A protein has these predicted regions:
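Conserved beta-alpha
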Residues: 1-268, 276-287
Length: 287
């Protein structure tokens, strides 16, 4: 049986990933482990739009942040691409967010993003592109969900910037349909035929909430960041590999796992790749 890749991103993104992965020849199915919806109070978003030109930088932490921020653009604003002020930088934490910004009409020259060869895509990698700039007395807006990491804001404040947050969306617990529950049951009972793809630590936590008694020790996962790798390890996944959050990199990783090399055991684990007492194995992919 072909290896089935389970995409756990929010529904709209998961559907797009499944389409792209399927086009590359993978068997992929969506099991969204996070719901995303607009915040009930849109007033702060409208105020942020009205004050946009006062900012030197607006940081978007995810494609969801881009989608919901632009969806809240006031009615008096013209349609993209004319909505984005020419003097304001848009900060992106990775390729998915950059793509969303481009689709929203932000010119490529105004997007600050991690280097393509960055070891990981996050706010730390974004800061490596921003740290050479002067930030004293500059205003920065961070667009995110109702909660998130404050690391970049703290660093910018240490450099003299005035940093504010605006919540563009909220995360909600997953509500899988009958097909989703069937996929969850199959993945739990037939781990050798399934491979999980995690793009957030919250998704891993939601999986535990959906199946608190599940034994994941024989299950495998791909994760797009070391923090997500650790979350999957903590949940008990037997094998976790880190990969870049791109369709191409995920495809390469899934093909490797679906085609075990000579001498691999039934789980696809090669000799010498021991799990050991310190926990499940982590293999860094050279993609």
């Amino acid at each position: 049986m072909a290896l089935c890749l389970i995409v756990t991103r929010p529904a709209a993104q998961a559907a797009d990933w499944v389409r792209q992965l399927s086009a590359l020849g993978l068997q992929a199915e969506a099991l969204p482990l996070l719901g995303i919806e607009a915040v009930a109070d849109q007033a702060p978003l409208l105020a942020a739009w009205q004050d946009l030109t006062a900012c030197k930088l607006v940081v978007f932490v995810s494609p969801n942040a881009v989608q919901h921020f632009f969806a809240a653009a006031p009615s008096f604003a013209p349609n993209p691409p004319a909505t984005w002020p020419s003097a304001v930088l848009a900060g992106s934490t990775g390729p998915g967010t950059t793509q969303a910004l481009r689709q929203a009409g932000v010119p490529a020259a105004q997007i600050a993003e991690p280097a393509a060869e960055a070891a990981q895509f996050d706010t730390e990698a974004l800061w490596s592109r921003l740290q050479a700039m002067a930030w004293t007395a500059e205003r920065v807006l961070v667009v995110r969900g109702e909660s998130g990491r404050d690391w970049l804001a703290d660093v910018l404040r240490q450099q003299g910037a005035e940093v504010n947050f605006v919540a563009a969306y909220r995360r909600t617990p997953p509500q899988p349909d009958a097909a989703g529950l069937a996929l969850l049951a199959a993945a739990s009972s037939q781990p050798a035929q399934h491979l999980w793809l995690f793009s957030s630590s919250e998704a891993v936590a939601c999986l535990h909430a959906l199946a608190p008694a599940a034994d994941w020790s024989r299950s495998r996962a791909l994760a797009s960041h070391p923090r997500i790798v650790q979350a999957a390890r903590d949940l008990g996944f037997g094998q976790v590999q880190i990969t870049a959050p791109t369709v191409q990199a995920v495809t390469q990783a899934a093909v490797r796992l679906g085609s075990p090399g000579p001498g691999a055991d039934a789980s696809g684990q090669a000799p010498g790749q021991a799990r050991g007492p310190e926990g499940p194995s982590i293999q860094l992919l050279d993609l």
